[in-house]
Amino acid sequence: MAKESMKAREVKRAKLVAKYAAKRAALKAEGNYEALQLLPKNASPVRLHNRCSMTGRPKGYMRQFGISRIQFREMASAGLIPGVKKASW
């Protein structure tokens, strides 16, 4: 399980990316790369990393559900994810 500080850092980065998204797009369209460099580092969407919403795990992230593969398996086995069931053929 990830430290609370790591989870908080990712949330903070996501807020910064959202805050500067319009300004970043406008500067990029103008080709004003000097002004683009003056924006905060964490305002770049490249610095975001998907994390499990429950555990904060950075690897094995499933975009469709927003959780890691481990949490997905546990929740699917318990029947907590609608429309997901164990395959059998």
From Swiss-Prot:
GO terms for cellular component: cytoplasm; small ribosomal subunit. Keywords: Ribonucleoprotein, Ribosomal protein, RNA-binding, rRNA-binding. It comes from the Bacteria. This is Small ribosomal subunit protein uS14. InterPro entries: Ribosomal_uS14 (IPR001209), Ribosomal_uS14_bac/plastid (IPR023036), Ribosomal_uS14_CS (IPR018271), Ribosomal_uS14_sf (IPR043140). One of its GO terms (biological process) is translation. Belongs to the universal ribosomal protein uS14 family. The keyword Cell division does not apply. The lineage of its organism: Bacteria, Pseudomonadati, Bacteroidota, Bacteroidia, Bacteroidales. Part of the 30S ribosomal subunit. Contacts proteins S3 and S10. The keyword RNA-binding applies. One of its GO terms (molecular function) is structural constituent of ribosome. The gene is rpsN. Binds 16S rRNA, required for the assembly of 30S particles and may also be responsible for determining the conformation of the 16S rRNA at the A site.
